[in-house]
Amino acid sequence: MIEKRRHPRVKASIPVYWGLTPECSKHDRITSFSIGGCFIQTTEGARPLTTVYIRFFLSNKGERIIRGEVRYNLEKVGLGVEFVNLTPDDRQNFQTLVDYYLDAQTK
């Protein structure tokens, strides 16, 4: 299988609140992420191109609600989500988090 990702992806296990509205009422887990998107392990489904919202705690910025778009749905497994319209500050914070996980995974 040819890898189509534009950004390095890291494995993780991060509890997360997400949902179809900014209230982010669902509680699941992110199992991998990059500055471009993430995989949410969940039994909830959502069709591709559905807008979702993900509540993150980024660096010293506190809580952020990030908007994403479902790219694929693995039934009863999870959702591949692409982040949409990240601010430059959010991109930098995600890159710092990716670098942290990359460093930890190579040790």
Where are the regions that the model predicts?
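Short beta-strand-centered aromatic/proline hotspots
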Residues: 28-29, 66-71
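Short, charged beta-turn/beta-strand-edge "cap" motif at the junction between a beta-strand
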Residues: 57-61
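C-terminal structural segments of small proteins and small subunits
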Residues: 73-101
